[in-house]
A protein has these predicted regions:
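Glycine-rich phosphate-binding "P-loop"
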Residues: 121-122, 144, 256
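Catalytic alpha/beta core domains of metabolic enzymes, predominantly
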Residues: 111-112, 125-232
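Short glycine-rich loop/turn motifs that provide flexible caps or phosphate-binding loops at active sites
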Residues: 24, 29-32, 62-64, 146, ...
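C-terminal alpha-helical cap/extension of soluble enzyme domains
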Residues: 17, 21-23, 32, 184-187, ...
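Active-site beta->alpha loop and helix N-cap motifs at the rims of alpha/beta catalytic domains
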Residues: 1-127, 137
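A general structural signal for well-ordered alpha-helical segments in protein cores
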Residues: 11, 43, 47, 72, ...
Length: 280
């Protein structure tokens, strides 16, 4: 954001920074993209701008989740028109539906598109989890519902997803601090906050783990683990936007209310980490 408006120059610069690394894809208008405070019009415009900036070099997955099924379907359809290659759909928040309600909710979204859908289970934000049973039922009925972003805080849950869904279903870590434990249990990668800044280290770590070179992956993981934790000292994306500005990648760290700017204490913690890791 810049003076209350979407900072499209910063968005283009951030996408360019990502494309310099060997990333596999971009997520637009997720939590880190401040989707909760975007209007529907802005939501679609940001997706369209991300697709244009990516230039077909990597797929763009658009966040289209909502706690209203009709709204999620509408967002998904509009995101597809805007050029998204797939959709990240978070569990409905606040109204806390039953597991059967979740199945019907995701089913209606799946029936609105043939493009890949990534389910997003994050109980700490939504108050509910997407059960293994619901995930398996959706995958059986709708093969394009083929990926899970798991921010469960539990390696046990990831293990259950991997065991139940098989090798063709992609389970992705949704927590930078748990990337390596999740991948050791069978996750295939990460949808990352830290990689907004640390593109090359994250790509190299994930690739090493996929190659079963856990010694190399662990070295990177342990080096950057304090950063993975520090960027969640305050609500995401406030700390990572500060980090990106300090690194000269974006010009504005501004966020919209009810998010507020970084406290001085967290700035000092991040500044010390930048110096320690050689990021500035």
């Amino acid at each position: 954001m810049n003076q209350g408006a979407v900072a499209y120059d910063d968005l283009e610069a951030l996408v360019a920074h990502q494309l310099k690394g060997n990333i596999n894809g971009l997520v637009s208008v997720g939590t880190t993209g401040e989707s909760p405070t975007l209007s529907h019009k802005e939501h679609v415009e940001v997706i369209r701008a991300t697709v244009a900036a990516a230039g077909g070099k990597v797929p763009v997955i658009a966040g289209t989740g909502s706690n209203s099924t009709d709204e999620a379907v509408d967002l998904t359809k509009n995101a597809e028109v805007a050029g998204a290659d797939g959709f990240l759909v978070v569990a409905p928040y606040y109204n806390k539906p039953s597991q059967e309600g979740l199945f019907q909710h995701f089913s209606q979204i799946a029936e609105s598109t043939e493009k890949p859908i990534v389910l997003y289970s994050i109980p700490s934000r939504c108050g509910i989890e997407i059960s293994v049973d619901v995930t398996a039922r959706l995958y059986e009925k709708y093969p394009h519902v083929c990926c899970m972003k798991a921010a469960e805080g539990s390696c046990e849950k990831v293990t259950e997803y991997v065991r139940a869904l098989g090798p063709d279903y992609a389970v992705m870590s949704g927590d930078d601090g748990l990337i390596l434990p999740f991948m050791s249990a069978g996750a295939t990668g990460v949808i990352s906050v830290a990689s907004n800044l640390l593109v090359d280290p994250l790509v190299q770590m994930v690739q090493a783990a996929k190659n079963n070179d856990y010694a190399t992956a662990r070295e990177t993981y342990l080096k950057y683990y304090p950063f993975f934790k520090a960027i969640f000292l305050e609500p995401n994306p406030v700390p990572i936007k500060y980090a990106l500005k300090q690194a000269g990648i974006i010009q504005s760290e501004e966020v919209r209310l009810p998010l507020s700017g970084l406290t001085d204490g967290t700035r000092r913690v991040l500044d010390a980490l930048f110096a320690e890791l050689g990021l500035i």
